[in-house]
Design a protein with these regions (language model features):
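Glycine-rich phosphate-binding loop and adjoining beta1-alpha1-beta2 segment
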Residues: 54-70, 253-257, 287
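Residue-level signal for pocket-adjacent positions within structured domains
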Residues: 63-72, 81, 188, 313, ...
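Flavin (primarily FAD) cofactor-binding/catalytic cores of flavoenzymes
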Residues: 1-51, 99-216, 220-462
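Catalytic cores of transferase enzymes with a strong primary signal for eukaryotic protein kinases
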Residues: 21, 27, 59-66, 71-78, ...
Length: 462
């Protein structure tokens, strides 16, 4: 295995989903603004383990729309004049008038993914795909963290080490499965729905699907399977009595406003928990009301015609699962009386949501430097900077894994643009502070530069 050291950067991003894509946009626009002023731009590079850009590619279902306004794109809330906005994308694609005539705030999910890919293509010079970060190690000089060395692996087995003054980890969300459930050819997570369905081509027509879950993904999966396989039975299993509608009312939507992040962050812990509890029905285990109506309409029409293929198994849960040679056996308990129903299905799809990926998994031993609160959660500043046990002039930032600190919008698209601007402001402010500092006696000065060079003499944390 060959290890090489490349040039350094002011910012290294781990992951290149919407969060860090928004950061790349903010950095690009910052650099365009400071160039005429003769100030140094921020140098940056993002590393993404996937071979190409993708956003929920397994759930780009026909007619599925995003759940937030198109104005909450990569840039508009931060810079309404941005050339990276969704409106700019529509203009570039020749569809602006058509979209206006469509009279909607909520684009198709497929279209919003294409918008993200359009922006990512414009910033291709800032990202390296098929590259997985395996470790982030602090560089310590005179007891102070002055930079981070980022270890990046590639499919060629080559390992690169890049030095960065700031590292932003946007690890994204990971599909969640109940304890004891393992994915297989017959046991899916909804995140892989489309490619898995394509794999069924050529087999005998499916007879029965089981969909587990009561949220938006579960309802969308149920509707999609009913439409794609009109002769198959689809059993929707969930512990609630029925699908619950999401609260997207005007006052409630204020919980996702940028200013609400300030309010939430500064609130006492008991108030944070209270607010999160009150408003979980904006995002968790809830379904768009129009989709609920569509599913109910389907069940009613099937009762009218006497051919009931959509089977709602409410107040129920899957208590056991066994794979067979050509399918899966699911044992479903009806919770009110404990009765067990055996379902012989071709496939069971768990639409059981996502969990924030652990950002410390890429830190290696550096994870031990992260301070945590009384509940064991990462201690994160308002500017998304991790609180470390060693003082530093370099920043380690985390996005997405901070709902406990920044509120319900932490994992959503709502504040991607504004948060990206906050990150840039924090990193630029740190650079200005460093420039203004005078080194103390015996201390090596730390001068911000466009390219941070590797310093072999620097002592690294073990």
């Amino acid at each position: 295995m060959e290890t090489t050291r490349g040039s350094g950067f002011d910012v290294v991003g781990v992951g290149f989903g919407p969060s860090n894509l928004g950061l790349a946009v903010a950095i690009e626009e910052h650099n365009m603004a400071v160039g005429p002023a003769g100030r140094s731009p921020l140098t940056s590079m993002f590393f993404e383990r996937r071979p190409t850009f993708g956003w929920h590619s397994g759930m780009l279902l026909p007619n599925a729309t995003v759940q937030v306004s198109f104005l909450k794109d990569l840039a508009t809330m931060r810079n309404p004049a941005s050339t990276f906005s969704f409106v700019a994308y529509l203009h570039d694609q020749g569809r602006l008038a058509d979209f206006i005539n469509h009279k909607t705030l909520f684009p198709l999910r497929f279209e919003f993914n294409d918008y993200f890919a359009w922006a990512a293509d414009r910033l291709a010079h800032l990202v390296t795909y098929a590259s997985e970060v395996s470790e982030v190690r602090p560089v310590i000089e005179d007891g102070v963290i002055t930079a981070f060395d980022v270890t990046v692996g590639r499919p060629t087995k080559q390992v690169d080490v890049r030095r960065a003054r700031n590292v932003v980890i946007a690890a994204g969300l990971a599909p969640h499965l109940p304890d004891g459930v393992t994915r297989s050819d017959r046991v899916w997570h909804s995140s892989e729905l489309l490619p898995r369905v394509e794999e069924l081509a050529g087999e005998r027509p499916p007879r029965r699907f089981v969909v587990v879950g009561a949220g938006q993904s579960a309802a969308e999966t149920t509707e999609f399977l009913c439409q794609r396989f009109p002769d198959a039975e689809v059993c929707a299993v969930f512990s609630r009595f029925g699908y619950s509608p999401s609260d997207d009312s005007s006052f409630t939507n204020g919980i996702f406003d940028p200013s609400s992040v300030d309010t939430f962050y500064s609130a006492p812990e008991d108030v944070k928990q209270m607010l999160s509890g009150y408003h979980r029905n904006t995002n968790y285990s809830v379904v768009d009301s129009e989709l609920i109506d569509a599913l109910y309409r389907r069940t009613y029409m099937e009762k009218v015609t006497g051919r009931q293929l959509l089977r709602i198994m409410n107040a129920s849960r899957v208590v056991d699962l066994a794979e067979t040679s050509d399918g899966v056996l699911a044992f479903v308990e009806f919770l009110p009386d404990g009765e067990i129903t055996r379902l012989d299905a071709d496939v069971i799809v768990y639409a059981t949501g996502y969990r924030p990926s652990d950002p410390t998994r890429v830190l290696g031993r550096t994870a031990r430097l992260c301070r945590r609160d009384g509940a064991g959660r990462l201690s994160i500043g308002r500017d998304h900077r991790l609180d470390l046990t060693i003082p530093g002039r370099a920043g380690l930032f985390v996005t997405g894994a901070s709902e406990h600190a920044h509120g319900l919008s932490a994992t959503l698209l709502s504040n991607v643009a504004v948060r990206a601007g906050e990150l840039v402001e924090s990193m630029v402010a740190e650079t200005i502070d460093l420039t203004a500092e005078s080194p103390s006696e015996g201390q090596r000065p730390v001068t911000p530069t466009r390219h941070l060079k590797a310093q072999p003499s620097a002592r690294e944390a073990s």
